[in-house]
Design a protein with these regions (language model features):
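Gly/Ser-rich catalytic serine loop of serine hydrolases
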Residues: 1-10, 115-118, 235
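Active-site SXXK
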Residues: 4-32, 69, 126-130, 172, ...
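Short, glycine-/Ser/Thr-/acidic-enriched flexible segments
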Residues: 20-21, 60, 74-77, 118, ...
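Acidic/polar loop patches that form or flank catalytic/metal-binding clefts of enzymes
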Residues: 24-32, 136-140, 181-190, 250-264
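Conserved catalytic neighborhood of penicillin-recognizing serine enzymes
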Residues: 24-91, 136, 148-178
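Soluble, non-transmembrane domains of envelope/secretory-pathway proteins that act on or interact
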Residues: 34, 38-40, 45, 49-53, ...
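Active-site-proximal helix/loop microenvironment
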Residues: 97-153, 157, 163, 191-199, ...
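Active-site Gly/Thr loop motif
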Residues: 170-197
Length: 308
């Protein structure tokens, strides 16, 4: 399918990589302030410093939990995690386990902000990992072929692999459920992440439930087409409602027989990862009307010069 810049919908892959490899808790706090990846830092091979901004160009200068950082889609937190990883390579390896070819992922720190062109199919396929206990299962479109006598002459076989440790995956599911904010008429567990790109040209939303994963992109066929403001052009306003309405309509359709008792899989025993972050939240930072935030990845088209 057509590939477009995915924006903040890519951030959960950066978070997942850090939690999976470094064992960082969603409750660990990070400073919402300018972060610079400089020449000589890690294996980024930059030739000049890179200091991306939040969408508003403002910083709270407050300590935010990882969980809150994802909900508020703070670019600063995502870049901090990328710097912590020391290289884009761990993230590229992670998404490769989720079905996205490494050839599509630039070897650049700006992938932390979603400076990547991918298709809705590729993104939705990768997000199924979160809804499936960290297991990526290759999407298939044709289940089987039968001849005119009803005899099966072809049956598809979908490969699968464990991309995320179950404990790390459940932490991500918990964070995505927290991040979703407004959920419309959808009943039962749901999580998700919005995405908005430069000049408000692309709006994304990836939604996960125990039964179904739905992804959508909204934008113009030509990249120069954009909405005139972030308020109108953010994924939370133009892409997310489509997914919520679609899932709600499926739940209301008796023919679908939606399983309202289904829950995201939680590994048995102790997770070893703290998820209850209430004691760490800063009560002085207000939510907007629907509890959502969208920090679009500004200036990511102005890439730093990279070495060979």
């Amino acid at each position: 399918g057509t590939r477009r810049q995915v924006g903040s919908t890519f951030k959960p892959f950066v978070y997942a990589t850090t939690i999976d490899l470094r064992g960082i808790s969603p409750c660990q706090q990070f400073l919402d302030a300018p972060v610079t990846i400089a020449p000589g830092d890690g294996r980024f091979y930059l030739q000049k410093p890179w200091t991306p901004k939040n969408a508003t160009g403002k910083y709270s200068n407050e300590m935010l939990t990882l969980k809150e950082g994802l909900r508020r889609s703070k670019n600063t937190i995502s870049v901090t995690l990328m710097k912590e990883l020391g290289s884009p390579e761990p993230v590229r390896e992670m998404v490769a386990q989720m079905g996205i070819s490494k050839d599509l992922i630039p070897q650049a720190p700006s992938i932390a902000l979603g400076a990547i062109d991918l298709s809705v199919q590729e993104m939705t396929g990768a997000y199924t990992t979160f809804a499936n206990n960290g297991i990526y299962k290759e999407p298939i479109y044709l289940l089987r072929i039968e001849d005119r006598y009803g005899r099966e002459i072809y049956k598809s076989v979908s490969s699968e692999k464990q991309a995320l440790r179950p404990e790390a995956n459940y932490a991500m599911v918990d964070m995505l459920q927290y991040a979703i904010g407004y959920r419309g008429k959808v009943r039962g567990p749901i999580g998700g992440k919005t995405g908005t790109t430069n000049e408000h040209a692309d709006g994304w939303f990836m939604g996960i439930t125990p039964n179904l994963v739905v992804g959508t992109w909204v934008g113009g066929d030509d990249r120069w087409i954009s909405f005139r403001s972030l308020a109108l052009g953010q994924g939370a306003k133009m892409a997310k409602p489509l997914v919520l309405d679609y899932i709600a309509s499926l739940q209301q359709d008796e023919r679908i027989e939606w399983d309202f008792n289904a829950q995201f899989y939680r590994p048995p025993g102790e997770l070893g990862i703290e998820l209850d972050c209430d004691a760490y939240q800063n009560p002085n930072i207000p939510l907007d009307e629907d509890g959502e935030f969208e920090d679009a990845p500004l200036n990511i088209s102005n890439e730093p010069d990279f070495g060979d």
